[in-house]
Design a protein with these regions (language model features):
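Noncatalytic, basic helical substrate-engagement surface that gates or grips nucleic-acid strands
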Residues: 2-134, 138-149, 153-158, 241-244, ...
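Non-catalytic nucleic-acid-binding/docking modules located in mid-to-C-terminal regions
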Residues: 2-3, 53-57, 147, 160-294
Length: 294
């Protein structure tokens, strides 16, 4: 018996995308922008209309500066400007919209949305459900296993394990090592100086994982990689930095708050709550009707 897929949504990606793409003249009666919440609501409706999904989790970030990763490496994501107040309040509205649509929401002050998604993916996959991670964040592709998908909904790009190898040059289970070696500018993870995406991919294709690279470091100079001899020295010099980076790039799969209540079966739409919220946000009738139908 084939069990239905579970859809695990990385909320921040789609809230930020709406913030930048939906005109900021969407406001409520107090003149507060509602564009990000409006666009996020439209995204949720579109996703539910396309999939008729009944097992959905929406993961939010509450840990931009309080994540355990910040304790390990204080510069983690330090390159990001704080969200403006006009956007911050919309995150709560976005969560309220998702809850009114009957979707289970998750957030944790010490763990990122990635870790909550990773935990739920592991939990539901172990119970026979295929997993669909809904995000454009390449980090989350590391969670995909045979039968699963990473879905960049806005670009309609849905990738399985083979397609992830084609797109990123490494297998899903190698992505954390790949980012530790090559760095991830988006999250302010420096990687090893002089090791770019091509070198990181070539090393992992040959050795399989980062531990094997360092355990067999003397072999690196003999590889048909440009600058192999100097690459070997860079790896030796910056090994500790790479191992620290991997502690940042690996997505956790055992977050207690998510495992305490992992049920994600969709509830019925809270019509009264949705109407109150839409009245507050002054959303139009067309979006309201879509929400009531999905």
């Amino acid at each position: 018996m084939n069990l239905p897929p579970v859809y695990l949504i990385d909320a921040s990606v789609y809230i930020f995308r709406a913030w930048f793409s939906v005109p900021d003249d969407f406001t409520n009666a107090r003149g507060e922008p509602t564009n990000a919440a409006y666009g996020f609501c439209g995204f949720l409706c579109s996703m539910l209309e396309q999939t008729s999904a009944q097992h959905v989790a929406v993961a939010f970030d509450e840990s931009l500066t309080t994540s355990y990763r910040n304790e390990i490496y204080p510069e983690y994501k330090a390159n990001r400007d704080p969200a403006p107040e006009d956007l911050k309040r919309q995150f709560q509205w976005a969560r309220s919209i998702a809850e009114c649509l009957g979707l289970r929401c998750f957030a944790d002050p010490r763990f990122e949305a990635d870790d909550l998604i990773g935990t739920l993916a592991e939990h539901w996959r172990a119970r026979g459900h295929p997993v669909c991670v809904v995000s454009s964040d390449k980090d989350l592709a590391q969670l995909v296993r045979p039968g699963d998908h990473w879905w960049d909904f806005s670009r309609n790009e849905k990738l399985g394990t083979a397609q992830i190898v084609q797109k990123f040059g490494v297998a899903p289970e190698q992505i954390a090592d790949y980012l530790a070696l090559a760095g991830d500018a988006v999250d302010n993870i420096p990687g090893i100086p002089g090791v770019g995406p091509k070198s990181a991919s070539a090393l992992l294709q040959h050795f399989g994982d980062m531990d094997s690279i360092f355990n067999r470091l003397e072999e690196v100079q003999h590889l048909s990689i440009r600058g192999a001899k100097s690459l070997q020295q860079k790896l030796r010099t910056h090994r500790a930095a790479a191992e620290l980076a991997r502690r940042l790039t690996v997505i956790q799969t055992n977050v207690a708050s998510a495992l305490a209540k992992p049920e994600i079966h969709r509830n019925v739409v809270d019509t009264a709550g949705l109407n109150r919220l839409f009245d507050q946000l002054q959303f139009g009738g067309m979006l309201r009707q879509r929400c009531l139908r999905v």
